[in-house]
UniProtKB/Swiss-Prot annotation:
InterPro entries: Ala_racemase_N, D-amino_acid_metab_enzyme, D-ser_dehydrat-like_dom, D-ser_dehydrat-like_sf, PLP-binding_barrel. The modification N6-(pyridoxal phosphate)lysine is found at K68. It comes from Schizosaccharomyces pombe (strain 972 / ATCC 24843) (Fission yeast). It is found in: Cytoplasm; Nucleus. One of its GO terms (molecular function) is D-serine ammonia-lyase activity. GO terms for biological process: D-serine catabolic process; response to toxic substance. Its cofactor is pyridoxal 5'-phosphate; Zn(2+). Zn(2+) binds at H385, C387. This is D-serine dehydratase. Its EC number is 4.3.1.18. Its main location: cytoplasm. It catalyses: D-serine = pyruvate + NH4(+). Keywords: Cytoplasm, Detoxification, Lyase, Metal-binding, Nucleus, Pyridoxal phosphate, Zinc.
C-alpha cells in the first residue's frame, strides 16, 4: 500500500528548510498547524528591541545584543536595529559561525564569545577571529591564559593579540572572579604584562541573580552593583596602566530594563566606557513578568499546545487537563510559584502548567469554578524561560499582532 506520510509536518524535521516551511504554513492560523509549536510575535519582538536600544542611546552608552535566546538571523537583525549597534554576544560557536553573513555585510563588527574559553574550541575561535574585525574572549582563570599562550605558539607570527574581557563575579556565582580575590589581580597583571599576546578590552558583569527583583527599583540596585563591580576591576587595571581604554560591560535583562537617566550621572566617574548587554529582552517570559520590569504585553513568545484529554474533579475542582507539551517543549524551569508556564488563551487564563512528563503536561486552574477546555482546544502558554523553551523547537512560527502566520524563523542548533 502506498504511503502518504511525506505530506505531514514530520517531514520537515529531517531537513528544516525555511522556504518549504513558509510555503506550507504562511497564511494559516496557529489553530491550523500541528501542535505543539513555538510562536514569536515579530511586532512585539521588534518593539522590545527598539526600546532597549533607545534606553542605551538615551543615556549615551553602547549596547551589545546577546543572540542566544532566539538564535536566528532575523532576530539578530532586529536586535541590531539597522546599524544602531554592531556588537553581539554568542553563547555557542554555532551562533558565531551562523552570523558570518552579517559580519561580511558589515552589520556586525564586534563579537564576544560569552563563555570562558575551552581548549578544544580554540582552533574554531581562531578561524572566527580572521573573519570578524573584533573577536572578544572571556577569561576568569589563569589556566585559560596558559591555554591561549600554548595555542598561540602554534600560530603564525603575525597572529593578532587576543582581545579579552575578564569576567567579574558580582554575586551570581556562575562564571567569574570576585574583586576581593587575588586571582583577579593576578589575571589583570598577567594580561597587561604580555601585550603581544593579550589585549585587555574590559570587564564583564552579569547579575543573573537580578531575576529576584520584584520592581524596577530593585533591578536598578542590581545594575548599580554590576557597574560598581566592573569599575572596581577597571580601577585596579588602570592603576597599573593609566593609558588603558576599557569597556565596562554590564547587564542582565532585568537590569537592562532598569537603565535610566540616573545611570548617566555615573558615567563621568567610571574608569572606562559603559556598555549594556542583554539577551532575553526581545522575547521575555514568565520570569521577566515576575520581576515587574515588564508586563504580559511585552512577552513576544508562547508555546501552543493541544488539549488531548481532561479529567473533571481530579485532584480538586475543576479538575485537570492533559496537553501534548511536556518537558521537552516547555523546559523544567519553574516559577517562584512552582508552575511551568501560564495559559493566556482567552477564557482559560486561570490555567497553569502544574506538572510535566517528557511529552505531555498537566494543567490545573486557580479558579475552582473554571470550565475545563475540551479535547482539541489549542492553548497558548507563556514559558517560564523562553531561552530554554525556544531551543527545543526546530522552527518558530512568526506572527504580527494576530494568530496568522507571516513567516518562519529557523534557529541554529548545536554548539
Amino acid at each position: 500500500m502506498a504511503s502518504n506520510v511525506d505530506k505531514f509536518s514530520s517531514r520537515f524535521y529531517l531537513n528544516v528548510n525555511k522556504e518549504e516551511l513558509k510555503k506550507e504554513y504562511v497564511g494559516k492560523t496557529i489553530q491550523q498547524v500541528p501542535t505543539p509549536g513555538f510562536v514569536i510575535d515579530e511586532a512585539i519582538f521588534e518593539k522590545n528591541c527598539n526600546r532597549m536600544l533607545d534606553r542605551a542611546s538615551d543615556i549615551g552608552v553602547t549596547f551589545r545584543a546577546h543572540v542566544k535566546t532566539h538564535k536566528t538571523i532575523e532576530g539578530t537583525l532586529l536586535q541590531l536595529g539597522d546599524g544602531r549597534t554592531k556588537a553581539v554576544v554568542v553563547s555557542t560557536l554555532m551562533e558565531g559561525f551562523s552570523l558570518i553573513p552579517l559580519i561580511l555585510e558589515g552589520k556586525i563588527d564586534d563579537l564576544l564569545y560569552g563563555l570562558p574559553v575551552a581548549k578544544s574550541r580554540l582552533p574554531e575561535l581562531y578561524e572566527l577571529s580572521k573573519i570578524v574585525p573584533h573577536l572578544r574572549l572571556m577569561i576568569d582563570n589563569p589556566k585559560q591564559l596558559d591555554i591561549l599562550r600554548e595555542f598561540t605558539s602554534t600560530l603564525p607570527d603575525d597572529a593578532k593579540p587576543w582581545s579579552i574581557f575578564v569576567k567579574i563575579d558580582m554575586g551570581t556565582h556562575r562564571a567569574g572572579v570576585t574583586n576581593d580575590s587575588q586571582v583577579v589581580k593576578d589575571l589583570i597583571s598577567t594580561i597587561l604584562s604580555d601585550k603581544s599576546l593579550f589585549d585587555l578590552f574590559g570587564f564583564y558583569c552579569h547579575a543573573g541573580h537580578s531575576y529576584a527583583s520584584r520592581s524596577i527599583d530593585a533591578a536598578s540596585e542590581f545594575l548599580c552593583a554590576e557597574i560598581d563591580a566592573a569599575n572596581t576591576a577597571a580601577k585596579f587595571a588602570t592603576s597599573i596602566d593609566p593609558s588603558l581604554k576599557l569597556t565596562l560591560s554590564v547587564g542582565a535583562t532585568p537590569t537592562a530594563h532598569s537603565v535610566s537617566p540616573k545611570v548617566k550621572e555615573l558615567l563621568p566617574t567610571l574608569s572606562g566606557k559603559l556598555e549594556v548587554h542583554a539577551g532575553n529582552y526581545p522575547m521575555n517570559d514568565v520570569q521577566q513578568m515576575i520581576t515587574k520590569c515588564i508586563s504580559q504585553a511585552d512577552v513576544a513568545d508562547y508555546v501552543f499546545a493541544e488539549v488531548i484529554s481532561n479529567y473533571p474533579g481530579r485532584n480538586g475542582e475543576p479538575g485537570e487537563v492533559l496537553v501534548n507539551a511536556g518537558v521537552i517543549a516547555m523546559s523544567r524551569e519553574t516559577s517562584p510559584e512552582g508552575d511551568f508556564g501560564i495559559v493566556i488563551t482567552p477564557g482559560f487564563e486561570s490555567f497553569y502548567v502544574d506538572r510535566l512528563s517528557q511529552e505531555h503536561g498537566i494543567l490545573k486552574s486557580k479558579d475552582p469554578k473554571a470550565t475545563l477546555p475540551d479535547a482539541s482546544q489549542v492553548l497558548c502558554i507563556i514559558p517560564n524561560h523562553s531561552c530554554i523553551t525556544a531551543a527545543a523547537f526546530p522552527w518558530y512560527y512568526i506572527t504580527k499582532g494576530s494568530d496568522v502566520i507571516t513567516d518562519i524563523w529557523v534557529p541554529w542548533k548545536g554548539w
